Amino acid sequence: MKNRISEPKFCVSIAAPNTSKLKSSINSAFLSGAHLVEIRLDSLNSFSINFIEELSNTHKNKLVLTFRSKHQGGLSNISESDRLQILNQLLDLKHSFKDIESDTFNRNSTLFKNEKNLIVSWHNFNSTPSTNSLSVLIKNISKKLSRPTQIIKIVTYANSLNDCNKVYKLYPRFKKSKFQLLAFCMGENGSISRILSPMLGAPFIYLSLIHI
């Protein structure tokens, strides 16, 4: 019998305005076959850590928690100190992944570096730097990581299909690294990279609910 190629895991990102809508969207995502759900906490008009803990315990090892900063596309107007306090509280939720922007991680690496379920993310919403530039960025982040379960996520905007090639070339460079690499491109030209990234080594891919 021939070995079947395993189906890639995919993560659905949800930016809900309130906790009621968030719960229903999470249920819809899992019913549609999602393996993971990313919760954009910055989109919620209000929430409590106890509520997020309840979700984390209900959906063990299936949630990615993130609170994007304003300059990284975040939707909340809270102060940076308040945002950092929330991120710190999320570290107590052991059954969920935490996605932290690279600049926040670099400024507070001692706080986050030992988190087992950590995703350090870097986004460029306008273009895709060279493969060498992205490699330097990844190496600098990786120096502060400490666990093989940790993930570095690189997301760039593809103005052409060649931009996707720049990202593809990252995977063989970091194949034997002490972390996992998750890299793909945004935009119409970058759509194909979401499909190909798990074949190159990404632990999972990101999709919207309408694409499931």
Where are these regions (language model features)?
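Alpha-helix-loop-beta-strand connector modules within alpha/beta enzyme cores
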Residues: 49-71, 171-177
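Acidic (Asp/Glu)-rich catalytic clusters
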Residues: 27-31, 48-60, 90-92, 108-115, ...
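Glycine/small-residue-rich loop that forms an oxyanion/phosphate-binding "nest" at active or ligand-binding sites
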Residues: 65, 69-100, 107
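Short, acidic/polar
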Residues: 17-29, 81-87, 129-142
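Conserved small/polar residues in nucleotide/adenosyl-binding loops
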Residues: 210-212
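Catalytic beta/alpha-barrel core
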Residues: 15, 36-44, 66, 95-106, ...
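Active-site mouth loops of central-metabolism enzymes
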Residues: 8-21, 70-79, 122-132
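Active-site-adjacent beta->alpha loops and helix N-cap segments on the catalytic face
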Residues: 43-55, 102-113, 159-171
